[in-house]
Design a protein with these regions (language model features):
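C-terminal motif of bacterial Sec signal peptides marking the signal peptidase cleavage site
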Residues: 8-12
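Sec-dependent N-terminal signal peptides
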Residues: 1-5
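N-terminal soluble domains immediately following signal/targeting peptides that reside
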Residues: 13-276
Length: 276
């Protein structure tokens, strides 16, 4: 099933004031996904090869993507189950003909959405054009939707404990920050390894309509991690993350805080409530 909908540019990670202007919908929204395979439902718990191209208004496949250091390159493939219970985040290679291919294992059955976060190279500037394209998928098996759950300031996943210190009152279009400490199973500060050009990723989806934005947590030695973005996250010592965020809509949101600790990708889900 296809849902070829382009959304506005993501907020990325960069500097911001107490109130920011949200980015407009990108003109690149006329680009669309083509040739998505497989065309039908996919299995849960087994690797499946997905492939597609992004086609431009003139019918040619997009082949010019931003490259280099930092997270604002190529495409991010973010698969999210529609009840916001699970997420898979990948950064696949792109073939010279524009084909995007990746092997994905879906952890659970049900309705999923692929959000392709695109960083397209623009001529005459180093700033990529950023926009998103959506694709619906069905994963075979019995679907039992899970509630989003209450707001909690501490989550333990894979033995690592993520704790938010002083939850702010979140409001639409206000730049704000979450200060999060992360400890390993022994209670010591966790050490993150750069992953997809950032020290950690904060992926946000709104419950219901799946509105999206994505920011990055950057350490001082990560070149271009915070480039050309609306609000920055940062980390200056092990186990301490400062997450930048600005919400485009009120409602209930899920934050998937992701990072590489050792050789493992760890994802901590938090429920958040945003006021208008």
């Amino acid at each position: 099933m296809l849902s070829l909908v382009a959304t506005g540019a993501s907020l990325g990670c960069g500097s911001g004031s107490s109130q920011v202007t949200l980015p407009p919908v990108s003109a690149a929204g006329v680009n669309h996904i083509s040739g998505f395979t497989p065309s039908g439902p996919v299995p849960a718990g087994k690797p499946v090869e997905l492939s597609f191209t992004i086609v431009q208004p003139d019918g040619r496949p997009l082949t010019q993507y931003a490259t280099g250091p930092g997270p604002h390159t190529g495409v991010h493939l973010i698969f999210v189950r529609k009840d916001l219970a699970d997420i898979v985040h990948l950064h696949p290679p792109i073939g010279p003909d524009g084909t995007i291919s990746e092997t994905v294992t879906f952890p659970a059955p049900g309705p999923w959405m692929l959000l392709t976060d695109v960083y397209e190279k623009q001529s005459g500037t180093s700033i990529p054009l950023n926009y998103q394209l959506k694709q619906d998928l069905q994963v075979n098996g019995r679907y039992a939707p899970k509630p989003l759950g209450p707001v909690r300031t501490s989550v333990t996943t894979d033995g690592y404990t993520f704790t938010i210190h002083h939850m702010p009152k979140l409001k639409v279009a206000n730049a704000d920050y979450l200060n999060v400490s992360v400890t390993d199973p022994g209670g010591k500060p966790a050490t993150f390894t750069p992953w997809f050009g950032a020290l950690a990723h904060a992926v946000f989806f709104r419950h219901g309509n799946l509105a999206y934005f994505h920011t990055h947590i950057c350490s001082p030695n990560l070149r271009l991690c915070a480039a050309n973005s609306a609000i920055a996250g940062s980390s200056t010592k092990p186990g301490q993350l400062k997450i930048g965020m600005v919400f485009p809509q009120a409602g209930k949101w899920r934050l998937f805080l992701q990072g590489k600790i050792g050789d493992k990708i760890v994802t901590a889900p938090f429920s958040l409530v945003v006021q208008s």
